[in-house]
């Protein structure tokens, strides 16, 4: 049996689509993702492309446009959907999840899910680099 002990993605091209909405959370997730790509995957900075879109609902369309080009080995989607007092959370989180999965299947390109779906700002902060780790970093590791 051959055991792989590391990831060498020096020639990999990775796209990161990130939502602008809730940027105070998303920027920490982005930092975690880039750190993991460069330190653990040896991905060169010039091989990482960051594309910003308005919010999490728009992430699937941005990912689809990138996947359609066929220039990237993987796509990482980053965002934060925080529950409020209306059903808006359920619609945005559900459609974002389904849309990103559809892109991965349709274009046979890995799409790592780094979108937080949380009940509070506190939970988002915990998952963006504090006591619950950094889900952006975890998404990048999944992409690798």
UniProtKB/Swiss-Prot annotation:
The active site is at 88 (proton donor). Belongs to the DMRL synthase family. One of its GO terms (biological process) is riboflavin biosynthetic process. The keyword Transferase applies. Pathway: Cofactor biosynthesis; riboflavin biosynthesis; riboflavin from 2-hydroxy-3-oxobutyl phosphate and 5-amino-6-(D-ribitylamino)uracil: step 1/2. GO terms for molecular function: 6,7-dimethyl-8-ribityllumazine synthase activity. InterPro entries: LS, LS/RS, LS/RS_sf. It is an enzyme of class 2 (transferase). Forms an icosahedral capsid composed of 60 subunits, arranged as a dodecamer of pentamers. One of its GO terms (cellular component) is cytosol. (2S)-2-hydroxy-3-oxobutyl phosphate binds at residues 85-86, 127. It holds the Pfam family DMRL_synthase. This is 6,7-dimethyl-8-ribityllumazine synthase. The lineage of its organism: Bacteria, Pseudomonadati, Pseudomonadota, Gammaproteobacteria, Vibrionales. The keyword Transferase applies. CDD domains: Lumazine_synthase-I. Keywords: Riboflavin biosynthesis, Transferase. 5-amino-6-(D-ribitylamino)uracil binds at residues 21, 56-58, 80-82, 113. Transmembrane segments: none annotated. It catalyses: (2S)-2-hydroxy-3-oxobutyl phosphate + 5-amino-6-(D-ribitylamino)uracil = 6,7-dimethyl-8-(1-D-ribityl)lumazine + phosphate + 2 H2O + H(+). Catalyzes the formation of 6,7-dimethyl-8-ribityllumazine by condensation of 5-amino-6-(D-ribitylamino)uracil with 3,4-dihydroxy-2-butanone 4-phosphate. This is the penultimate step in the biosynthesis of riboflavin.
